[in-house]
Amino acid sequence: MTTEAAKEESVEWTLAGLLELFDVEPAGDDVFVGQTGYAGHDERQVVEGTQVLAQAIVAVAKRFPGKSVRSAYAVFARAVVVGPPVELALDVVAEGRSTATAIVNVTQGGKRCITLTVFTDVPSDDVIRHQLARPDVVAPAEANHAHMPMVGRQLRLVDVVDVNSPDEVGPPELHAWLHYDPIPERVELAKALVAYFTGHLGISTTMRAHEGIGTAQAHLTVSTAPMTISVSFHEPFAWSGWLLYTHESTQVGAGMSYVRGAVHSEEGELIASFGQDALIRPLRTSDTSIKAESRL
């Protein structure tokens, strides 16, 4: 075994390591470079699209200091693979005193993979204010522990034991408690971290309503992939303790599903809202399988 292969095999994902990946470095005028990490134990060679979404949020925050990232919309046109870095090129659409917008083109190896639109502004005083109430679900201590191999992160599911199982049948909704330790002090990294999980359970949410199908079959008998994700951050953006991710699948058909979601603090503050379009289609003969533990 080569030294590099041994290094990859021994990699243990940590929250600190994930935040390092999010913290992209400048590489020229309006250009940033981000690392993709290692495949790790699950042998997954495809980078999570939300990892690059998180990197784009950080890049735009660095480009527009003094402004707050309020929303981001990503289209995942081509997979990013583990290994080579990605380049994030910012096209500044407009930059004013109170708002700024950039289109982020993400390339790897000279090929465009992801396009994002990110909006920022300077938060103002309230004219009016209301929010969606946090769902009345069991507390984290009463929820089911879920295996998620990352040091510094805990996941607990409400009313679901194995989110991948085709035997987990219920309404097309999922509630997940998530805990990070430590919570990033830099707000752009905190927003990137919240955005990162928005793509993890959407497909499972949709499949839950249909008997005999689950994400354990993803890339074995069905082809699945998030294709777009949108996330909006609500000010003031801050939390301590646990986060509750609520997912609701409002439609699936013709090979695509749509999920909308919300992120509440344990105290009940709505800090983010998100949406996901995902592909759910019969497996093509050209598709390849991945290990079950990487499908969460």
Where does each model-flagged region fall?
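Terminal targeting signals and extreme-terminal segments of soluble enzymes
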Residues: 1-296
